[in-house]
Amino acid sequence: MARNAEKAMTALARFRQAQLEEGKVKERRPFLASECTELPKAEKWRRQIIGEISKKVAQIQNAGLGEFRIRDLNDEINKLLREKGHWEVRIKELGGPDYGKVGPKMLDHEGKEVPGNRGYKYFGAAKDLPGVRELFEKEPLPPPRKTRAELMKAIDFEYYGYLDEDDGVIVPLEQEYEKKLRAELVEKWKAEREARLARGEKEEEEEEEEEINIYAVTEEESDEEGSQEKGGDDSQQKFIAHVPVPSQQEIEEALVRRKKMELLQKYASETLQAQSEEARRLLGY
């Protein structure tokens, strides 16, 4: 096939083709597909476009053409593909077959379509151009997301801050901050002391007297304390050492007697109650 294509491109072959076409009026393909009103001509122009696409696809396979020539050929092929689609729509409008459904799929043979790039395709050596190869590389899968249990397994003392002092950085900083804070407190105490001295000796004497008499006890307080001690002694004298506690049997007998009295008061007459009381008294109960 390559040998036949080379023969067709020789000067003799082109001269012979020009001789055969002399005297014929070469019909030019309409710029717009909508200008064609005949179905056979629309089919003819579609076949012509497919032939041009095939020639350019064969040329673009040669990687030695150079980057700019390969890009131009790829643009021309995409332009012809769009034009072919217009003629297929026009053929369908004129009552012809729907090549969009019944036509062969050309993506696998003619080029790869970049997703989201409005149908622009790359053919032959154009797939290996700088910046194009990366478009067809698959993105690496994101790392699997760890569950909460897996994250908790990796938690140690360092997570809670127990090892912060081992880095040798935080301890010197804390010591420096502590020195600074102590110096500030000392300066504050000195300023307060100087302010107290500036107020006068009288206030100092009053403060000293208050400090001296802070543990002084008045007569009223001493009397109250004495009365409390006496009261404590009286309470100790009145304390009863032993209180007899009734046994379980004595409690049951008392309950039985109480129940009997309630029944007698409820059902017996006054005369019968008086007789029973007298009998109990005589018997010694």
Curated annotation (Swiss-Prot):
Query: What domain of life does the native source organism fall in?
Result: Eukaryota
TM regions (residue ranges): none
Locate the compositionally biased regions of type Basic and acidic residues: 227-236
GO biological process terms held by the UniProt record: generation of catalytic spliceosome for second transesterification step; mRNA 3'-splice site recognition; mRNA splicing, via spliceosome
Q: Which residues carry this modification: Phosphoserine?
A: 247
**Subcellular localization(s) per the UniProt record:** Nucleus
Keyword terms: Acetylation, mRNA processing, mRNA splicing, Nucleus, Phosphoprotein, Spliceosome
**Gene Ontology CC:** catalytic step 2 spliceosome; nucleoplasm; nucleus; post-mRNA release spliceosomal complex; post-spliceosomal complex; Prp19 complex; U2-type catalytic step 1 spliceosome
Q: Which Pfam families match?
A: Isy1 (PF06246)
Q: Where is this region: Disordered?
A: 194-244
Keyword tRNA processing among record annotations: no
Q: Which residues carry the post-translational modification N6-acetyllysine, per the record?
A: 127
Record's compositionally biased regions (Acidic residues): 203-226
Note the InterPro entries from the entry.
Helix_hairpin_bin_sf (IPR029012), Isy1 (IPR009360), Isy1_sf (IPR037200)
Q: Which GO terms describe its molecular function?
A: RNA binding
Please describe the quaternary structure of this protein.
Identified in the spliceosome C complex. Component of the XAB2 complex, a multimeric protein complex composed of XAB2, PRPF19, AQR, ZNF830, ISY1, and PPIE. Identified in a pentameric intron-binding (IB) complex composed of AQR, XAB2, ISY1, ZNF830 and PPIE that is incorporated into the spliceosome as a preassembled complex. The IB complex does not contain PRPF19. Interacts with CPSF3; this interaction is in an RNA independent manner. Interacts with the microprocessor complex subunits DGCR8 and DROSHA; this interaction is in an RNA dependent manner.
The Swiss-Prot or TrEMBL record describes its family as follows: Belongs to the ISY1 family.
Entry function:
Component of the spliceosome C complex required for the selective processing of microRNAs during embryonic stem cell differentiation. Required for the biogenesis of all miRNAs from the pri-miR-17-92 primary transcript except miR-92a. Only required for the biogenesis of miR-290 and miR-96 from the pri-miR-290-295 and pri-miR-96-183 primary transcripts, respectively. Required during the transition of embryonic stem cells (ESCs) from the naive to primed state.
The entry's protein name is Pre-mRNA-splicing factor ISY1 homolog
